[in-house]
Amino acid sequence: MVANLKGSRINILDLTKAFGHKTVLNSLNLEVAPGEFIAIVGRSGCGKSTLLRLVSGLDKPTTGGILLDGEPLRKLSHSVRVMFQEPRLLPWKRVIDNVGLGLQENWQSKATWVLEQVGLKDRAGEWPHVLSGGQRQRVALARALVSQPHLLLLDEPLGALDALTRLEMQYLIEDLWRERGFTAFLVTHDVEEAVALADRVIVIEEGRIMLDLPVRLPRPRDRASELFINIREAVLEQVMNNESNNKNQLLQMSH
């Protein structure tokens, strides 16, 4: 039903966001190519979720701006979808109705198809409360993808899942991203998750980009490889603000 959707290009231009006297993001500049998978990591309160809200159009910058496919972003676009840590399913609607929410023509066939993509076609007629946490997040992923977005924003969507389910969801998200070609923008606390999924890992500290690291490893990523482990540990050191971290060495690792 879908063949290689074009991902959106994002240009973040001198972006600042302040709440009162507190500056959360400070003169941020970032370019994301169409179809690229970006992971944003950093300590709690560093501004990564605020950045995602700004890119989604759910919030507005104090100064600076964001271009989505060359056009100023002023509100949530129909080509952008957000997936949160909580599935946010409507308990009074069945699974297929949650997925098809807001769709019009042929919505049932579209919803059924995307449920098949996430492995839940046989649960379409069930209520959300009978599903496991991982299954509910699969429904949330299906709901985000059913409208065929060009940009998928992922706000720590796997943070509440157990380790095995989280790993399964990571593989699922990666497979669907590779198949569809949308741009993916992931906010996560999990450095291993970031290195496993992203084309680039970006570390934010005190509202600024402190590291923008390409991860040039073949997919699917071998998490036991020495290079993967070295990159993961080096990014973690940067997140933990270890002064001995050498950014030039990081860039050499990715080649």
From Swiss-Prot:
Role this protein plays: Part of the ABC transporter complex SsuABC involved in aliphatic sulfonates import. Responsible for energy coupling to the transport system.
Any one Gene Ontology molecular-function term assigned to this protein's record: ATP binding
Reactions catalysed according to its record: ATP + H2O + aliphatic sulfonate-[sulfonate-binding protein]Side 1 = ADP + phosphate + aliphatic sulfonateSide 2 + [sulfonate-binding protein]Side 1
Principal localisation: membrane
UniProt keyword annotation of Cell membrane present: yes
Name assigned to this protein: Aliphatic sulfonates import ATP-binding protein SsuB
Primary enzyme class: translocase
Domain of life: Bacteria
GO cellular component: plasma membrane
Localization (cell): Cell inner membrane
Pfam families in the cross-refs: ABC_tran (PF00005)
Membrane-topology annotation of the record: Peripheral membrane protein
Family according to the record: Belongs to the ABC transporter superfamily. Aliphatic sulfonates importer (TC 3.A.1.17.2) family.
Key words, A-Z: ATP-binding, Cell inner membrane, Cell membrane, Membrane, Nucleotide-binding, Translocase, Transport
Ranges of residues in domain ABC transporter: 10-231
Subunit structure: The complex is composed of two ATP-binding proteins (SsuB), two transmembrane proteins (SsuC) and a solute-binding protein (SsuA).
Keyword Isomerase: no
The enzyme's E.C. designation: 7.6.2.14
Residues holding ATP: 42-49
InterPro entries: AAA+_ATPase, ABC_transporter-like_ATP-bd, ABC_transporter-like_CS, ABC_transporter_ATP-bind, P-loop_NTPase
Gene coding for it: ssuB
